[in-house]
């Protein structure tokens, strides 16, 4: 199957090898790889064709048993509209794009993200929201840390209401322990007579009861504390917004806005806050700026908060978020509009409250009728067993005397035989159950608005002979404030309008369906369409993460296989798939190291990090409770061994870990990597190998063989999961046996390696569900299953070949900053523009914008060295695209030379004025000393950027992060 995945043909591969002076791919790899590093054992994973792969996945899907889930707990059945499934989730224009660091070629997804931020701000009643987080539980931890940063209190106590979901509570405990925060349980009604920096409660508690938190928040604010609320977006269409309740921070999951449960994700969570907190907010933030033509344009704003700039001082370690799912979620809101969302929520609430009343009439003890969607029943929970075994219904068992039932968009429809099955469990007439839906249908939802007329109309609404409806109309938390009034949420409820809107936005963006994205350290390779197909199969997509394990046999077999494959391919003994991004894999690995030392009663908290490391490394170390000590790099870009020895010996009694990326972020295989690991081990530390660059290793080198103790792998880089415009990703953590017990899990015996006894993972959880974003694992499983071990090995070699071919072809155009053994690079290389900038005034930013005119996404800019571009072409690009890139860089060099020899004006030339838009070219006015054709570099199928060059400084000075008003 590698023939489909690998871009160049065998003849083209031979041509590139000949140009470099090698006879075979293995000859090239042997010349590039370090001496003295153990070769991996022969791992035999056979390759398969697409049909065999899909047939096998279909067999696994049939092994899953999809029952009617009424489990709730933050994961809900929902309906993914076909227009969203087809035009977003299955559309490579959306799922193959990268994080929008180059805003001129990202206006489509940036617009959808600012729509998402606006939606969150409107529904939460808060002024600022970011462009998605990861899972809900890790988002809860980020909300806690944000509260700690901005609180006036010096306390380390964080009050957590006892009504929060248990899985969120457990993640909070894991994250709080690492940074010295004390979680204090807050039973309902308990007085607060001690200092605390924050308080967190769930608006609808886990029991289903709606909590009026105004009094609690008022008391906490008087103590200088920050008030945090966990909330449900659908519920907020009916009930008072968190901002109006006094919350300072609100977070939650957008999963029920059309995103399947998929055994835990992927999904998008959200975080909103008061405007004063905008510079402390974690994650990405989209803002409005202006371009060179004074048009509104979107960009990522306030990036100085983030890990790639602030490193250990960043507000969070989050890099990849969940952009694709956030875009799908806001499209769901646009598809339904505010009235449609209210109708869905109203039906759920009507059915849930009505069913609770029926239960009470049948002598069941219901904890509260003051609910949105969840009913708690105080009765022996033998009902759970009977409901599951006899009627395929899943209820949440709290304890031996209590269960919970949650209604959602699907179950509230009361379709099919659901009323009959509920009737058999609870002894209620199925006709009465079915009538609950009829009561909903007779209700008018139009009174949910912020108008005075709505307030005055309460009495007439309440006087109707519909008791459930009356309860909602009279509810003290009933929402009066408006939301989603912007035309973008009201103009696209028709499918034609939404389809055209999404098409227009995707046309503004540059993704892999348009051309090469040679971003260094990002591995923008093929995401094969057939590998993505199974993600939305109902047998996978509709599986609740807390369903009985017997219902997930097929998915669990896939998980077991992929764990075994990843452990064997990387040279480790154990795997946790729980981390929902590479940043979370880093955190999980460092927490495992921390847990290991704590088990030995050793207080080790120093983390050595090379100066060249990615910013997430330092940010993750801080979140794991470690102190960062920077290790210098030498002139060749390698870790300075002398400085490493000095720092390791100086911190010998406190040394916990070294974080090192391999191949290095400078794009070379460091020859002394084994010695680097030995130095750290000598002084009692562990070696964390960042697996971001594993696309240069698979089949040839295993990080666990040269001294790594723990690593993470980026499945959205090396193993075929698409980047989605900024997520979702998966960052599994792999570890040696001595660290395996400290990986995140929930006390499940875990045995991915056939050579070792089973181990129990005792590390605290870091994500909402055991397997993180399990729904995307099918993609990586298919990638490995189809390519096999030899196919993946060939992918590695071709990736290295293409990088070296381009580097050598361009070495006379721009210097290659670092090379390794035999003057070779790994899978990426750094082009140095610093001298050119000095003599011409043309910066790497100018070059990146000019590349847009030529139809390329820019390489990684000014990382890890300012004034450089890091190029990673991957193995998937056709040889014709490789040649086009080489030709383009040479053309740009020729343009720079015209600036140097003063043929071009130094401030008014095709590079300084790039990118060139269609609007500019079509304008009657052309005030530039070069021709229109020179500016646009016209080719067949040309990509036109949606905006001219965007003013970054303006965007950071004028923070505006919601939908701007439409022009007249």
UniProtKB/Swiss-Prot annotation:
The gene is gcvP. InterPro entries: Aminotrans_V_dom, GcvP, GDC-P_C, GDC-P_N, GDC_P, PyrdxlP-dep_Trfase, PyrdxlP-dep_Trfase_major, PyrdxlP-dep_Trfase_small. The keyword 4Fe-4S does not apply. Belongs to the GcvP family. This is Glycine dehydrogenase (decarboxylating). Its cofactor is pyridoxal 5'-phosphate. The modification N6-(pyridoxal phosphate)lysine is found at residue 717. GO terms for biological process: glycine decarboxylation via glycine cleavage system. Its EC number is 1.4.4.2. The glycine cleavage system catalyzes the degradation of glycine. The P protein binds the alpha-amino group of glycine through its pyridoxal phosphate cofactor; CO(2) is released and the remaining methylamine moiety is then transferred to the lipoamide cofactor of the H protein. Keywords: Oxidoreductase, Pyridoxal phosphate. One of its GO terms (molecular function) is glycine dehydrogenase (decarboxylating) activity. GO terms for cellular component: cytosol; glycine cleavage complex. The keyword Oxidoreductase applies. The glycine cleavage system is composed of four proteins: P, T, L and H. Disulfide bonds: none annotated. It holds the Pfam family GcvP2_C. It catalyses: N(6)-[(R)-lipoyl]-L-lysyl-[glycine-cleavage complex H protein] + glycine + H(+) = N(6)-[(R)-S(8)-aminomethyldihydrolipoyl]-L-lysyl-[glycine-cleavage complex H protein] + CO2.
């Amino acid at each position: 199957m590698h023939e489909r995945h690998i871009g160049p043909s065998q003849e083209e591969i031979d041509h590139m090898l000949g140009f470099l002076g090698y006879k075979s791919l293995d000859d090239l790899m042997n010349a590039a790889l370090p001496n003295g590093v153990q070769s991996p054992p022969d791992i035999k994973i056979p390759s398969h064709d697409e049909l065999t792969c899909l047939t096998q996945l279909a067999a696994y899907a049939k092994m899953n048993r999809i029952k009617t889930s009424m489990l709730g707990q933050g994961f809900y059945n929902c309906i993914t509209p076909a227009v969203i499934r087809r035009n977003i989730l299955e559309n490579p224009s959306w799922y193959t794009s990268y994080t929008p660091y180059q805003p001129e070629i990202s206006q489509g997804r940036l617009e959808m993200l600012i729509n998402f931020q606006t939606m969150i701000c409107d529904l939460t009643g808060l002024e600022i929201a970011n462009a998605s987080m990861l899972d809900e539980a890790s988002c809860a931890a980020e909300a806690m840390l944000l509260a700690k940063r901005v609180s006036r209190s010096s306390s380390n106590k964080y009050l957590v209401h006892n009504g929060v979901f248990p899985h969120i509570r457990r993640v909070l405990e894991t994250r709080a322990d690492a940074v010295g925060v004390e979680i204090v349980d807050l039973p309902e009604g308990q007085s607060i007579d001690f200092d605390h920096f924050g308080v967190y409660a769930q608006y609808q508690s886990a029991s289903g009861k709606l909590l009026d938190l105004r009094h609690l928040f008022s008391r906490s604010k008087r103590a200088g504390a920050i008030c945090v609320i966990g909330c449900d977006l659908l519920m907020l269409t009916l009930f008072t917004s968190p901002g109006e309740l006094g919350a300072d921070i609100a977070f939650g999951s957008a999963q029920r806005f059309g995103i399947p449960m998929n055994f835990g994700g992927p999904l998008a969570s959200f975080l909103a806050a008061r405007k004063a907190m905008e510079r402390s907010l974690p994650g990405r933030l989209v803002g409005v700026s202006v371009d060179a033509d004074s048009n509104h344009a979107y960009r990522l704003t306030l990036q100085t908060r983030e890990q790639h700039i602030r490193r250990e001082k960043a507000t969070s370690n989050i890099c990849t978020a969940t952009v694709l799912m956030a875009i799908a979620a806001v499209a769901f809101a646009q598809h339904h509009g505010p009235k449609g969302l209210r109708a869905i929520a109203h039906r759920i609430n009507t059915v849930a409250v009505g069913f609770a009343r029926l239960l009470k009439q049948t002598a069941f003890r219901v904890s509260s009728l003051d609910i949105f969607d969840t009913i708690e029943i105080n009765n022996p929970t033998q009902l759970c067993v009977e409901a599951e075994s006899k009627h395929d219904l899943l209820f949440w068992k709290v304890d031996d005397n209590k269960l919970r039932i949650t209604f959602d968009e699907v179950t509230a429809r009361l379709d099919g035989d659901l009323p009959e099955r509920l009737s058999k469990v609870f002894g209620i007439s199925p006709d009465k159950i079915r009538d609950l839906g009829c009561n909903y249908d007779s209700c008018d939802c139009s009174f949910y608005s912020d108008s005075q007329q709505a307030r005055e109309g309460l009495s007439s609404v309440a006087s109707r002979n519909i008791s459930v409806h009356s309860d909602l109309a009279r509810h003290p938390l009933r929402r009066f404030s408006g939301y989603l009034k912007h035309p973008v949420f009201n103009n696209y409820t028709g499918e034609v309008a939404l389809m055209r809107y999404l098409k227009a936005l995707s046309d503004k963006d540059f993704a892999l369906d348009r051309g090469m994205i040679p971003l260094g350290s990002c591995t923008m390779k093929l995401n094969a369409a057939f590998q993505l197909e199974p993600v939305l199969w109902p047998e996978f997509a509709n599986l609740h993460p807390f369903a009985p394990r017997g219902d997930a046999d097929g998915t669990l077999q896939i998980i077991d296989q992929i764990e075994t494959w990843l452990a064997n391919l990387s040279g480790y003994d154990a795997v946790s798939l729980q981390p929902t991004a590479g940043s979370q894999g880093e955190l999980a690995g460092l927490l495992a190291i921390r847990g290991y030392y704590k088990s030995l009663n050793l207080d080790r908290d120093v983390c050595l990090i090379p100066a060249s490391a990615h910013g997430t490394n330092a940010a993750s170390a801080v979140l794991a409770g470690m102190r960062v000590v920077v290790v210098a790099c030498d002139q060749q870009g390698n870790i300075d061994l002398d400085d490493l020895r000095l720092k390791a010996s100086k911190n010998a009694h406190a040394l916990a870990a070294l974080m090192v990326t391999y191949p290095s972020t400078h794009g070379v295989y460091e020859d002394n990597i084994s010695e680097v690991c030995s130095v750290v081990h000598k002084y009692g530390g562990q070696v964390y190998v960042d697996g971001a660059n594993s696309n240069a290793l698979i089949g040839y080198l295993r990080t666990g063989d040269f001294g790594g103790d723990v690593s993470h792998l980026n499945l959205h880089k090396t193993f075929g999961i698409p980047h989605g415009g900024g997520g979702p990703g998966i960052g599994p953590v792999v570890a040696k046996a001595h660290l395996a017990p400290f990986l995140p899990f929930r006390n499940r015996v875990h045995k991915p390696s056939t050579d070792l006894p089973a181990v129990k993972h005792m590390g605290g959880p870091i994500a909402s569900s055991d397997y993180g974003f399990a729904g995307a694992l099918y993609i990586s499983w298919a990638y490995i299953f189809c390519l096999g071990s030899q196919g993946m090995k060939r992918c590695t070699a071709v990736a290295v070949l293409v990088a070296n071919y381009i580097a050598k072809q361009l070495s006379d155009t721009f210097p290659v900053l670092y090379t390794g053994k035999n003057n070779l690079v790994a899978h990426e290389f750094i082009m140095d523009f610093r001298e050119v900038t000095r003599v011409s005034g043309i910066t790497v930013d100018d070059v990146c914008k000019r590349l847009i005119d030529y139809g390329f996404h820019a390489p990684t800019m000014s990382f890890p060295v300012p004034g450089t571009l890091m190029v990673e072409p991957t193995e998937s690009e056709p040889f014709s695209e490789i040649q086009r890139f080489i030709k383009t860089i040479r053309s740009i060099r020729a343009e720079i030379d015209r600036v140097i020899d003063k043929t071009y004006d130094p401030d008014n030339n095709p590079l300084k004025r790039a990118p060139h838009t269609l609007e500019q070219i079509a304008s009657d006015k052309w005030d530039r000393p070069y021709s229109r054709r020179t500016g646009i570099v016209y080719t067949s199928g040309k990509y036109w950027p949606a905006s001219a060059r965007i003013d970054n400084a303006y965007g950071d000075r004028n923070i505006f992060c919601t939908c701007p008003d439409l022009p007249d």
